[in-house]
From Swiss-Prot:
Secretion signal, residue range per the UniProt entry: 1-23
The protein's name: Putative lipid-binding protein AIR1
A matching Pfam family: Hydrophob_seed
One of the protein's GO biological processes: lateral root morphogenesis
Localization terms from the record: Secreted
GO CC, alphabetical: extracellular region
Domain of life according to the entry: Eukaryota
Keyword Nucleotidyltransferase: no
Induction of synthesis: Induced between 4 and 8 hours after treatment with auxin and remains high for at least 24 hours.
Family: Belongs to the plant LTP family. PEARLI1 subfamily.
Disulfide pattern: C28-C58, C38-C57, C74-C110
Source species: Arabidopsis thaliana (Mouse-ear cress)
Membrane spanning stretches: none
Keywords for this protein: Disulfide bond, Secreted, Signal
Amino acid sequence: MAPRTPLALFVSLNLLFFTYTSATTGTCPKNSIEIGTCVTVLNLVDLTLGNPPVKPCCSLIQGLADLEAAVCLCTAVKASILGIVNINLPINLSVLLNVCSRNAPKSFQCA
């Protein structure tokens, strides 16, 4: 019978490394109230061109890569979660991403 020490060490190391890789991913918020905080960013940028309070909106997409953040916000805007009647998708999406110091990939289109 083979010793169990190498097998136990192998399983332990696999569990350890798997835990590290799966704990670092962000997710797109599914709560419409959370994503609705981004509306204030759009309204304040349109009205006051100053320094809008962006922390609530940017913190929602903080753990996401740029492409994931763009897809998340695009899906929210398209689903009318944000409650905006007349929206210009490319401009509003780029405003939200720029305010959060993010960039959509050049080939990305929110259609």
